Amino acid sequence: ILRRFPLEAGVNPQFVEIDERAQNLLLDEVVEAIADGQGQSSFDGIAEHFTGPDLQKFLHAILNLDHHFDSHPDADGIWKALDLPAGYDDASLAQECFLPGDFQHIEELKALLMTKDENSNDFKAGLRLQAIPGPELTTADLPTLESVFLNKTGKAPGSAKIGSFPTKATRAELPGMAQVEALMLRVEAGRQSRLSLNVARRSLALYDFAAEFLGTYRARKQARGFLDFNDLIMRTRHLLSDERVATWVLFRLDGGIDHILVDEAQDTSPAQWDVIRLLAQEFTSGEGARAD
């Protein structure tokens, strides 16, 4: 269809369809250009959060969801969407969760826990607390503190283990137990803010990188007259949906299509189904309707 109506579809008449291998080579080229060029900050930002082993899979996911990146919310917009105050950061979170002297109370708790039986939950908790280096508590310590101080399951997951950790006997031995329990409650209260801040940062990094990546990818495709598979589908759908030219295109196609073969891979592709629907309408309506 695009070969027959390139001007109506807004594509280069000499466009080149690129296969998956050629596309992957282009993706590598684009990422390298971003990492070494003006978009380096966006690359560094996503690299800080991306932990998957398959970069190509990640890039293809962005391409498949490119319409979600048409608008680029700023940091304030993302923070607001996650119920975080503008400018909320690690310092804000630390101020909510920690008080001077908290690390000393953790050190005292840790020392006591490490004296318990090696098979006890108290001792195992002490081992986890060894991951906190000091000399003060920071937001980087919150996941460790949450793993020790908060319930993972039960009626109230994420709630502080007040009255249940450490064991009753150990609690009686710890002079600063009241201060530890106060810290437990602050860790509980700060958990949602920590998670939201993490999502906000990852979202901002993703939007920044996607904008740079998609812009560079599209520019390089256009300069070389390339169309990838998604381009073929989206351009065809737009062509058949454009009221200015769709009737003319379908009229010219009438008689040239006897059947539509649907591959099972299209079951999960709404855009491809749109193309099929638009083509099928010509079989069943208007002057082009088929008796059979």
Predicted regions and their residues:
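Conserved helicase NTPase motor core
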Residues: 1, 15-26, 182-292
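Conserved P-loop NTPase-based nucleic-acid remodeling module centered on helicase motor cores
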Residues: 1-45, 93, 97-101, 108
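A structural signal for alpha-helix termini and helix-coil/disorder junctions
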Residues: 4, 33-40, 65, 115, ...
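Generic N-terminal leader/targeting and pre-domain segments
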Residues: 33, 51-52, 75
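Short, glycine/acidic-rich hinge or "gate" loops at secondary-structure transitions
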Residues: 39-56, 290
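Residue-level signal for alpha-helix termini/capping positions
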Residues: 51-55, 60-63, 67, 241, ...
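Conserved ATP-driven helicase/translocase motor core recognized via long
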Residues: 58-230
